[in-house]
A protein has these predicted regions:
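Bacterial N-terminal signal peptides that target proteins for export
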Residues: 2-11
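ATP-dependent phospho-/nucleotidyl transfer catalytic cores
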Residues: 476
Length: 759
C-alpha cells in the first residue's frame, strides 16, 4: 500500500510539474491578448474608452465592429446589443473622435441603408476577437462576418444564407462623401471626408472595395434615400448597396483598401492582399503580432497576469498610427495632415504627447527603437510642413491638452541613442515651440509670454490650467536643456532653459506644501483647496500635480522640508478620502473614476500622478514604491472589458503596466534611468533589437511576496533604486529575491536615489 501510495503521489507531482512547465511555455503570446479590454465604457465612466482594434501593430487603418451611431465616439461598447457595421477607423479616443471613416455591413432579405434598420443583434458568445481576426454572427441577417487586416487593407469573408436578396451596404458617412459602383469590375470606389478637425481643406480618405462575386443589384444612397440602378453618388451623405443571389453557406470575399493620397494609391495599397487567401491574411497577422509581442518573453504560471500583460502590450503597440504609404516605385510617401500636400518620407499620428511622453515613447526607445526612429523622422516632417511639432496630432494639429511635451519625446529618443534623422531640425523645433504658440492648437506654449517673463503662467490672465502649464513648461525646459547639452550646444544657447527648468518653485506655496495657482502680482489663490479640481490645474487637483517635478524630485523634497515631510505628503495622497473635492466643479469622468476606486486622492485613471508611487525611491522608502506599484497592478488592471480605471490613452496607461510588470518605470524621460518598482513575474526575457537579452528573475515571487529582499545585477549585489539604459542595452541579468516583508535597509542611502536635476 505504501508503495502504491508513493507511486500515485509521484505521478501526481510529475503531473503538476508537467502542467506548470506547460503553463510556462508561452509560444504564441497573441493567444493571451483580449482586444475587448477597456470596451465596457461610457461617457460618464471610462474603463479604458477603447474599441476592439483589429489591426497590425502601428497600422495605418484599424477596423472595428461598430455598435454606436454614426459619429458617436463610443464606436463599440461591450454592453451594446446590436452591430451597425464594420468600420474602418482612425479614432485615437472618443474625445478626439474619428476621421476618414466608413462602414460596410452585410444584410439579407431586406433592402436597407439606414444604420438603425440594418443593425443586427449579436452575442459575445458568437463573437471571436483577436488582434488579427474578428468573427461574429449577425443574427437578424443569418450572416457570419469575418475580417482580417493588413497595414492599409483588409479582407472580409461573409457567409450568407439562401436568398436572392443578399446585400453589402457601404456607408461613406456624412459631412461630404462620394461613391461609384463599377459593376463590370465587381468594384466600388469612393471617399469619405468626415473629420472632427486637424485636417487641410483637401482632406479625403479614398477607398476601393473589390468583390469576388458579380453584382445582380446596384444602388446608391443619399442622406438615407435609396436609388436603385444608380451607380454614382456624391453629397453630404453618400452610400452604396450591391446585391447578389446566394446559396446557404455561400461565401463572398471583399478586399478593402484606402489611401489618404489618391484612388490610384488605394489600388496600390490593395496589393497588400494580392495572392493571399483569407486564411493567409489571418495567418500573416497572427505571425506579425506574435513576432512583436514575443520580444517580451514572460514565463509565469499566473494566467490572469499573463493575459493582462500581453493585452496591455497589444494596446501599447497600436499608436502612434502610421500615416505613410508606399508608392509604385517603392518609395515612402505621405499625405500631409498639416499642409495638404503629398510629400516624401514618414508620418505618424494619433497620439497626444501629454499622455504618451511619460512611458509609451520611452518604452519604444527600449524595445522598438527602429520604429521610433521612423517616428522621429515623422516629427521632422511635421515641423517642416507646419512650423511646429504637434502636441496632439489627429491627424494634424489639434487643440487638446497642455504642455510642450514634444520636447520630452525628442530628447528621450536622442538620449537613448536613436539616430538617423535630422536632429538639428528637431532642435530648432523644440526651441521654437518653447517661445511661440500655434493659434487654434495645443502646439507650442499657451501663455509663453507670461511664463518667460514671470517664471510662471498666472491664474488671472484668462489661461486655464495655468499652474499645470507652469509645471509642464519647467520640465519641458529641462528636456530642451538636456537635449542641447547632449548635442553639445553652447552654454549661451541653452542656459536659459537650464534656468527655467527650476520655475516649478515659483508656484510652490510653503504654507500649503503644495503647488498653488498664482496671480500676475504674485498672490497665491486665496480660495485654494488641495482637493479642488480647479481651473488652475488640468484634469486633476493640486495633490495630483504637486509631484509633477519629474526632473527634480530632490528639489521638490527640499521645498517640502526633506525626506520625512515629502513621504508624509505622498502618504497623504492615499489617506485623504476620495470623495473630497467632488463638489469643487461640475463632475467629469476623471473625477468619478478616482472617487470609485477607493485609493484616496490617487487618480491612476489620469496621467499626472501615475509616476508618483515611484518617487518613494528618491526619499529612502523604496519598499513603499514596491507596495503601491503591486497594489495598483493587482487592483486597477485586468484583462476584462472593464480593464482600466480610466482612459487607456493611446498606449500610455497600458505601457505603465508593461513597464511596472517588468519591475521599473521611466519617472523622468530624458534621463537614462529606469526607476525600480517590483517585478510581477517569475521570469522575463527582453529580446532587444541589438541582439542582447535582458533577463529578469524573481525568486519566490507571489501575490504576497511583493517586496524586494535582495537584488543582484550580473551576479553582484545591487542596492541602487534604478537601472540605466546603458546597462540594459549591453544585456544584463537581474535577480531578485522576493519576500512578504519589506526590506527597510535596502536602497536607503543617498547614492541609491535616482537622478535629480538640482543635486
Amino acid at each position: 500500500m505504501k508503495t502504491a501510495y508513493f507511486i500515485k503521489r509521484t505521478l501526481l507531482v510529475c503531473s503538476v510539474m508537467m502542467y506548470s512547465l506547460h503553463a510556462l511555455a508561452i509560444k504564441n503570446p497573441v493567444d493571451y491578448v483580449n482586444p475587448l479590454i477597456g470596451t465596457d465604457s461610457k461617457y460618464e465612466l471610462s474603463t479604458g474608452n477603447t474599441y476592439p482594434t483589429i489591426a497590425l501593430p502601428w497600422g495605418m487603418n484599424f477596423w472595428t465592429p461598430q455598435t454606436g451611431k454614426m459619429g458617436d465616439g463610443w464606436t463599440y461598447t461591450y454592453k451594446a446589443d446590436k452591430i451597425r457595421g464594420f468600420k474602418q477607423t482612425h479614432q485615437p479616443s472618443p474625445w478626439m473622435n474619428d476621421y476618414g471613416q466608413f462602414t460596410i455591413m452585410p444584410v439579407a432579405d431586406k433592402l436597407v441603408f439606414d444604420e438603425d434598420k440594418r443593425a443586427s443583434w449579436y452575442s459575445h458568445k458568437a463573437e471571436v476577437v483577436k488582434p488579427y481576426f474578428y468573427k461574429v454572427y449577425l443574427a437578424d441577417h443569418d450572416i457570419t462576418a469575418e475580417m482580417a487586416p493588413t497595414e492599409r487593407a483588409a479582407m472580409f469573408r461573409f457567409t450568407y444564407p439562401e436568398t436572392k436578396e443578399s446585400y453589402l451596404v457601404l456607408d461613406a458617412f456624412d459631412r461630404g462623401s462620394y461613391v461609384k459602383i463599377i459593376p463590370e469590375e465587381n468594384k466600388i470606389i469612393g471617399y469619405s471626408t468626415r473629420n472632427t478637425g486637424g485636417v487641410p481643406e483637401n482632406f479625403k480618405n479614398y477607398f476601393v472595395l473589390q468583390f469576388d462575386k458579380p453584382f445582380t443589384f446596384v444602388s446608391t444612397a443619399s442622406s438615407g434615400d435609396i436609388h436603385p440602378n444608380k451607380t454614382e453618388e456624391s453629397g453630404k451623405h453618400a452610400g452604396a448597396i450591391v446585391g447578389f443571389s446566394t446559396r446557404r453557406g455561400e461565401v463572398v470575399h471583399v478586399k478593402v483598401a484606402s489611401s489618404f493620397i489618391s484612388y490610384e494609391q488605394a489600388e496600390l495599397n490593395l496589393n497588400e492582399l494580392t495572392g493571399k487567401s483569407f486564411d493567409d491574411v489571418v495567418a500573416n497577422g497572427r505571425n506579425v503580432w506574435n513576432r512583436e509581442l514575443a520580444k517580451l518573453e514572460v514565463n509565469d504560471d499566473n494566467i490572469d497576469n499573463l493575459r493582462t500583460f500581453y493585452s496591455n502590450l497589444y494596446r501599447t503597440l497600436l499608436f502612434p498610427r502610421s500615416f505613410y504609404e508606399i508608392d509604385k516605385d517603392g518609395k515612402v510617401m505621405h499625405y500631409s495632415p498639416y499642409n495638404g500636400e503629398v510629400l516624401p518620407g514618414y508620418m505618424f499620428t494619433d497620439t497626444g504627447f501629454w499622455d504618451t511622453f511619460r512611458c509609451l515613447f520611452p518604452f519604444l526607445n527600449l524595445m522598438y527603437p527602429s520604429m521610433n526612429q521612423k517616428m522621429q523622422e515623422g516629427l521632422v516632417n511635421a515641423y517642416k510642413e507646419s512650423g511646429f511639432l504637434p502636441e496632439w496630432a489627429s491627424p494634424g494639429h489639434r487643440d487638446c491638452m497642455i504642455g510642450q511635451n514634444s520636447a520630452s519625446v525628442v530628447a528621450d529618443a536622442y538620449v537613448k541613442g536613436i539616430r538617423g534623422y535630422d536632429i538639428e531640425a528637431l532642435w530648432e523645433a523644440v526651441k521654437h515651440g518653447a517661445n511661440a504658440h500655434l493659434k487654434g492648437s495645443a502646439s507650442g506654449r499657451v501663455g509663453y509670454e507670461y511664463y518667460n517673463k514671470l517664471g510662471y503662467v498666472p491664474n488671472n490672465v484668462g489661461i486655464r490650467s495655468n499652474a499645470a502649464r507652469t509645471l509642464e513648461y519647467a520640465f519641458n525646459d529641462w528636456s530642451i536643456y538636456t537635449l542641447g547639452k547632449k548635442l553639445g550646444k553652447p552654454e549661451s544657447e541653452i542656459a536659459v532653459y537650464k534656468e527655467r527648468a527650476m520655475n516649478y518653485r515659483n508656484i510652490y506655496n510653503p504654507e500649503r506644501k503644495l503647488m498653488v495657482g498664482k496671480s500676475d502680482k504674485g498672490v497665491f489663490n486665496p480660495n485654494f483647496k488641495g482637493t479642488d479640481w480647479s481651473r488652475d490645474f488640468c484634469e486633476g487637483n493640486s495633490w495630483h500635480w504637486s509631484f509633477c517635478v519629474f526632473h527634480d524630485p530632490q528639489g521638490l523634497m527640499n521645498l517640502m522640508g526633506g525626506q520625512d515631510e515629502f513621504n508624509v505628503m505622498m502618504d497623504s495622497v492615499f489617506v485623504i478620502p476620495s470623495k473630497m473635492g467632488m463638489d469643487s466643479r461640475g463632475m467629469i469622468h476623471e473625477m468619478r473614476e478616482m472617487q470609485v476606486m477607493n485609493m484616496g486622492q490617487y487618480a491612476h485613471g489620469n496621467q499626472p500622478i501615475q509616476h508618483m508611487v515611484y518617487l518613494y525611491n528618491y526619499s529612502a522608502q523604496p519598499w513603499k514604491a514596491q507596495y503601491w506599484v503591486r497594489e495598483i497592478m493587482n487592483k486597477l488592471y485586468n484583462a476584462a472589458p472593464d480593464a482600466y480605471c480610466g482612459d487607456e490613452d493611446n498606449g500610455q496607461t497600458s505601457a505603465w503596466y508593461v513597464f511596472s510588470a517588468l519591475g521599473f518605470y521611466t519617472v523622468c524621460p530624458g534621463t537614462d534611468q529606469y526607476v525600480l518598482g517590483t517585478p510581477l513575474f517569475k521570469s522575463v526575457k527582453l529580446h532587444l533589437e541589438n541582439g542582447k537579452t535582458v533577463t529578469i528573475e524573481a525568486a519566490n515571487n507571489s501575490f504576497e511576496n511583493r517586496y524586494i529582499k535582495t537584488m543582484k545585477v550580473n551576479g553582484k549585489n545591487y542596492t541602487r533604486n534604478y537601472l540605466t539604459h546603458d546597462q540594459l542595452m549591453k544585456g544584463i541579468k537581474i535577480q531578485y529575491q522576493m519576500d512578504a516583508v519589506p526590506n527597510k535597509m535596502r536602497g536607503i542611502n543617498e547614492a541609491d536615489a535616482p537622478y535629480s536635476f538640482s543635486e
